[in-house]
Each structure stands twice: as C-alpha cells, then as structure tokens.
Amino acid sequence: MKFLYGVILIALFLTVMTATLSEARCGPCFTTDPQTQAKCSECCGRKGGVCKGPQCICGIQY
C-alpha cells in the first residue's frame, strides 16, 4: 500500500512540475514596462499571452 501512495505522490509531483515549467518559460511581467503585453505575446508565439501577476500566461488556441 505504501508503494502505491509513493507512486501516486511521484505522479502528482511530476504533473505539477510539468505544468509549472510549461507556463514558466516566459520572462516575468512588469507593470512598469509599457511593452509588457507585446513581450508576453511574442514569448507565447503570438497566441494571446496575458500577464497575470508576475508571470506571463500563454493562452491556448483551438
């Protein structure tokens, strides 16, 4: 049973790390920079990047 809990914990950890790294590939957003939105969009490959707090979040285009 402990082995199963360990496997689940590792899978959860890897899932969180993958999600974090996929969103963290862009540089930080600074509200004092007038070009922040353009830089965020460029970093996301022109797919609708948005600054949320200190990080740039890339939108998903379907």
Swiss-Prot record:
Alphabetical list of Pfam families matching this protein: Toxin_5 (PF05294)
Domain of life: Eukaryota
GO molecular function (one): chloride channel regulator activity
Signal peptide range in chain numbering: 1-24
Residues that make up the propeptide removed upon maturation: 62
BP-aspect Gene Ontology terms: venom-mediated perturbation of biological process
Biotechnology: Could be considered as a biological insecticide candidate, when fused to Galanthus nivalis agglutinin (GNA), a protein with the potential to cross the insect gut. This chimeric ButaIT/GNA variant shows a gain in toxicity against insects when administered orally, while maintaining similar effects as the wild-type toxin when injected (toxic to insects and non-toxic to mammals).
Keywords, ordered alphabetically: Chloride channel impairing toxin, Disulfide bond, Ion channel impairing toxin, Knottin, Secreted, Signal, Toxin, Voltage-gated chloride channel impairing toxin
Cystine bridges: C26-C43, C29-C51, C40-C56, C44-C58
InterPro entries: Scorpion_toxin-like_sf, Scorpion_toxinS_Cl_inh
GO cellular component: extracellular region
Subcellular localization, as worded in the UniProt entry: Secreted
Keyword Disulfide bond: yes
Tissue distribution of the protein: Expressed by the venom gland.
Family affiliation: Belongs to the short scorpion toxin superfamily. Chloride channel inhibitor family.
Domain remark text: The presence of a 'disulfide through disulfide knot' structurally defines this protein as a knottin.
Protein name per Swiss-Prot or TrEMBL: Lepidopteran-selective toxin
